[in-house]
C-alpha cells in the first residue's frame, strides 16, 4: 500500500506477500474501500491494538496459518498477518473473504 512503508513513526517494517498484493488488486476491482484495510495496516504497523470491532485474534487449529493472526476489515473481509517482534517486521499474508482464505 502506497505511503505506509515510508512512515517514520511505524514500530514495524511492513512486508506484503505477492499473494496479498494480488488479492488487494482483486478487491479494488470489486469496489472494496481499500482505505479500510490501509487504516488497519497503519495501526498494526504502529504497534497499536485494534478496536474490538475488528475481531483481531490468533488463528488456532490451522495448519496452513500456524502462528498467524486474523482480523475483520468487514464481516466477510479478512486480513491475515504475522508479527515478528524480534525483527520488528509485520507480514501481511492474505486478504479476502472467509471462503477464499480459510476454507480451501
Positions of the model-derived regions?
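Residues that form or immediately flank small-molecule/cofactor binding pockets and catalytic motifs
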Residues: 19, 64, 97
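Short, intrinsically disordered/low-complexity patches at protein termini
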Residues: 39, 60, 103-104
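A short, surface-exposed loop/turn module that caps and links secondary-structure elements
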Residues: 45-72
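Enriched for short, Lys/Arg-rich terminal
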Residues: 1-10, 22, 29-35, 71-78, ...
